[in-house]
């Protein structure tokens, strides 16, 4: 089958083949050498930013360091400034991957990564999802995320859904009547996995609980559920495991 997902990454400037090769090199680092490898990478990252990132230079207050422990700890509050003031030299806003957190902690967080770094994240996502039998090129995703209302943003997400083999459910209205339609869609489509906001997926699980129903009884192809890095309470985790699939529950950041 044609790899539409991999193609969409490449068309958007994300070199997935090269990133996969780099990931294999990282995974090949032996357990005995891993601590030294991490310390060396930490040193390289800090030295790079002290040399090429004016915002980080100002935050640290000097252009060199001797020990990791002497570096000040950054929080989201230190990032509350325009993105262009935080980017390193050679990385204009037009040539980086930009995203943001939900701000559920009280401090919104808009961040950027260079495209190779972000592709490396995708390469690792592909590897980890594979543990549960999920292939981004072929597996059907039930997606519980919002979508932009503006025309261009909306169409862009719809195209990504098409290429990524994703069916997107609305999260702006999750009344019982709407969730009943969601359930019908699960009965009629062979979804392989769920990916969405914690709050939205938990609400769907509570709806199923009221109906005394486990989702895999109507959608037996379902393999796993992935929720975003919002706070997931133990009770909610058990609820998801009980009402959705009784198999696996992965917990990861949105990418």
Where are these regions (language model features)?
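Active-site periphery "cap/insert" segments of enzyme catalytic domains
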Residues: 187, 199-210, 229-234
